[in-house]
Each structure stands twice: as structure tokens, then as C-alpha cells.
Amino acid sequence: MKKTRNVASSPIECVHLQTKPTTTLVRSFFFFLFNSQTISSFIIFYLFLCSFFWFCQSPNLTNPSPPPLSVAPLRGDANSPPPESSSSPATKSSLMISSRDPNALFSGGGISFLAGVRTVKFSYGYSSLKGKRATMEDYFETRISDVNGQMVAFFGVFDGHGGARTAEYLKNNLFKNLVSHDDFISDTKKAIVEVFKQTDEEYLIEEAGQPKNAGSTAATAFLIGDKLIVANVGDSRVVASRNGSAVPLSDDHKPDRSDERQRIEDAGGFIIWAGTWRVGGILAVSRAFGDKQLKPYVIAEPEIQEEDISTLEFIVVASDGLWNVLSNKDAVAIVRDISDAETAARKLVQEGYARGSCDNITCIVVRFEVS
């Protein structure tokens, strides 16, 4: 629209301009500044001006509630694809990255068997949501594979920081490297430690030309026969239910853990408070893959725990986007009342979002039946 101007007939007449309210306020401000005789009047006008600009630039205040979640179809819905055969590797790990709707919540799962001393039937479900973060940095992996004649199930959640590329690398390479290790079946714990270190070293070589530092946590669970082996690096977490009680199967790697702080200082590093305790004032976890500028203080050596599956009802593997707002006890209580693993995983993610999680949220639920 063209601006029109009415020229004043004398110097003392007002000039009327069809201008934006902000222009008028700015002119009024300078007029008032040079003509006001009292400091108190100036302060009142200044506060009014600040309030006006705050109101103009604030988001829509009439609709403070978050947008509704877009939900992928449940397994078995009319429009969903048929389930994959449990005899082939199941990889459901990057749907949330490729979605056209960045706010969509994705979920899925399956059912399978493992033969050990006792037959283990398990069902698993996964769910992932970008949530309130600007970008999605979580990846996850579910695999069921035959390794040297032994069926192995793998579940992993990888929470990236400084970008998603480390988490994506782990999704693509960690399990592949593990099952390639000669002693993976015969000495699983030893193989896990060696492969985690190997994968971290190979990633750092690949990262050599990257100007920006990036890293990722890893919370992993392996089902081999009737054994559950958990290995974690960072603050993604694995929690089990035993007789209805929450049992942590991993311990978060935080810089303020006394043993972690001692290890970092012994290696020549330091931790300082910057909103939370951080390694070198930068990273809020004390172990991670990647983070080349913080080696050797931030390591990818996992802590490992083994359990007999027959003593457990289910496990939850999740990124800290869930654990920041849900306690272990709360998560177990929610899953306990939901028999379907996929529905339980979806419920956990939705509950984390509803409770105000500001991070990406990804979780996997695995239910056990031992006969």
C-alpha cells in the first residue's frame, strides 16, 4: 500500500503520516526524550515501549498448548505394512530422521524366540520423537541375527550431541562390528569392550576432517540364549522390572560421579560447573563415542552388567530425554500395565513429552516370557 502524506500548513501544525505503529512510537519516543522534564515520566514511557515491543514479537499467546502428536500406525493397522519375519535382521532405526513431519512419533516392534537352556519368547517395541528440540539427534537399532549358529537380539539407543552423525555411525556400525568379533559368542563381555573401543577409534579417524565436534551415548542390551547383557556409555539408560520393582541395569556416566571425576583428573582433565558439571566445561557426560577434542578424558569404555532373563519381566532402554522427566520407578509402573511392548514404548514417549521433556525422546521396551 502506498504511503500518503499531508503536508502541514504551518510549522506548529501536526504532521499526519499513515505509518506503522512502531514508527509512530519511535518518533514519540524521541519527542518525549527531548521534551520531558521529569525522570519518572521517562521511566514510565520506557517501560511502556519495552512492553509494546515484547508483545509484538512474542509467539501467539492465545494457543500455549503444544501441537498434537502425529502418530504412525500401530502394528496390524489397516494401512500399516505387514510385520517383518523374525528370522531376518530387523532394522527399524531411521524412520524418524526421514519423516516429512519432524514432530511425528514413530513406533513399531516384533516378537521372536531365542533358544538357550530355556526357550525365551520376547516381544519388543520402539518409539521415537523429536519433541521440542530443533533437530533430531537420537538414533536406535533393533536386530535379531544368527551369529555362528546362535540367535542374538540387539537393542540400542544412541543419543547424539553436537549433531546426529555420531549416533548414526553407531547405528550403522556398532552391531556389525560386534558380530564380526571372533569371541562375541564365547566371551561376549570381552568382545563388547574391545569393539566399543575399536568403533570409537574408527569413527574418530573418519571424523578427522570435520571442523565441528560431535559425540553420542550408547545404551545397549543383548539377548544371547537366556542371558541379558547390558553395556552402556553415557547417560542413556537401561532399567528392568523384577517382581514389579525398578532395577537399574546401567549407571549414568556423569562428571560428578566421584569415580568418573577421579578418572578424568588422573588423565589430566578437569570438570567445572557450567549450568551442570561438565568435562572441560563443555560436555555433561563423562563417557561417549566421538568428542575428539575431549579425548582421553571422555572415553567409550562401557560398563557391563549381566542378568538371567528368567528373573526379569521387561526392560526399558531409553535416551535421557525420557529419564530427565521420568524416574525409573515411574517408567516401570507405566509399562507394567501395558502388555503390548510397542504400545508401552509409545506411552512412555508421550508421557515424557507431556511432562515437559525438552529433548529428543527415544525408547525401546522388551518383554520376556521364559518357558
Curated annotation (Swiss-Prot):
InterPro entries: PP2C (IPR015655), PP2C_BS (IPR000222), PPM-type-like_dom_sf (IPR036457), PPM-type_phosphatase-like_dom (IPR001932). One of its GO terms (molecular function) is metal ion binding. It comes from the Eukaryota. One of its GO terms (cellular component) is membrane. Its EC number is 3.1.3.16. Residues 85-94 have a biased composition (Low complexity). Residues 67-95 are annotated as: Disordered. Mn(2+) 1 binds at D159, G160. It is found in: Membrane. Its cofactor is Mg(2+); Mn(2+). Mn(2+) 2 binds at D159, D320, D359. The chain crosses the membrane at residues 29-49. Pfam families: PP2C. Residues 123-368 form the PPM-type phosphatase domain. Gene3D superfamilies: PPM-type phosphatase domain. Belongs to the PP2C family. PANTHER family: PROTEIN PHOSPHATASE (PTHR47992). This is Probable protein phosphatase 2C 11. It comes from Arabidopsis thaliana.
